From Swiss-Prot:
Protein name per UniProt: Nucleoprotein
Record note on quaternary structure: Probable homooligomer; forms a double superhelical polymer. Monomer.
Protein origin, superkingdom: Viruses
Site (Cleavage by host CASP3/caspase 3): D269, K270
Sequence motif DEVD, residues: 266-269
Keyword Hydrolase recorded: no
Cofactor annotation: Mn(2+)
Underlying gene: N
Organism, as annotated: Crimean-Congo hemorrhagic fever virus (isolate C68031) (CCHFV)
Amino acid sequence: MENKIEVNNKDEMNKWFEEFKKGNGLVDTFTNPYSFCESVPNLERFVFQMASATDDAQKDSIYASALVEATKFCAPIYECAWVSSTGIVKKGLEWFEKNAGTIKSWDESYIELKVEVPKIEQLANYQQAALKWRKDIGFRVNANTAALSHKVLAEYKVPGEIVMSVKEMLSDMIRRRNLILNRGGDENPRGPVSREHVEWCREFVKGKYIMAFNPPWGDINKSGRSGIALVATGLAKLAETEGKGVFDEAKKTVEALNGYLDKHKDEVDKASADNMITNLLKHIAKAQELYKNSSALRAQGAQIDTAFSSYYWLYKAGVTPETFPTVSQFLFELGKQPRGTKKMKKALLSTPMKWGKKLYELFADDSFQQNRIYMHPAVLTAGRISEMGVCFGTIPVANPDDAAQGSGHTKSILNLRTNTETNNPCAKTIVKLFEIQKTGFNIQDMDIVASEHLLHQSLVGKQSPFQNAYNVKGNATSANII
């Protein structure tokens, strides 16, 4: 077997794709870039099947079947071909050999990370490595393979018939987020943070230093129920949505305030002024500490960069450019028929290729007891095989034309359009998956609700599985659903 997508740069990619498009019925009616999707997937039958299911194994199987049906034909073909092309495969794998130091903090702790929640530094280092990998190998070929840095969507337009369902999903996402922010894993649980306090901090860091004289809660040193100064909790919360740059801005504001007080020293009580400056700097330092240990930052750092993690798993499994086509074929077949975890693991162990057993050995331990939203994004699980699938299994590289048969992998759903002209098929499909899950399971008992995670990805503005959203600013659950 050999990789038939012999491409090393964008010009060669464009040429390959034009040839491929001539012989295959690619369309872009319902998807962003071209795909094999000719109609919006109809998942209604899975709701009825789920309603009559009697055990969890049966329910899991039904949901897996619905996922394959939903995503079988909607992957972005151009981008999938690029991710699996000979040039990217070669550079993508070689990068890990040359950058052992870059991935050291989490790669050397892989065994521990299979069973334990990662340290904040291990998450931050993963995200830095992912961005470096993208830059070093020239991964970006268009906007659909870019590292995003915009703000989350302010508005998300959906058809009238699903508005209430999307709002229900958002409400559950907010409930989970509040549980995490107010309780889950912070070394200093700070309690809820008032929007009024955050807004005050937002204005303060813009340079409005006179506001320090009279904050809405009274004394600048006043603490909340947690015993932590309200300035500190407000700044930490602001940093979660605006980025850690707010701390530098806050320090500049304090410098400006100090300059003002010094300039008007004849009208200022020196002891009080010095005390205010000292305390403000102390509150900023506390805010930085809270931010560093925050569950929100942890959840942000745990976001998977689909392409980067998938290449890391190939590298760890000893896959080479020569054996890559066998992995591609395996994942293509995996996406044609839904398989439960047991069957998928058995398939990996049954392949004569060494990478099968090695991928199996990379799987997270079943004894991982924490909330799985915190699991390190470089740790492979049975569910995350789908991340590899969308990268390498959409197009079997030894026989690219076979892609027309369809191969379903979860993140392909992000390629469905979100515009109103097409009635937002992305949201409609995600909502139907949520309805299927809700019919079979108690949503509130689940650590991660897969359909809600997909909605979150859409709300942060992802329109492709291959975009990195680590630097997207803002809170996705604040979007106005209209």
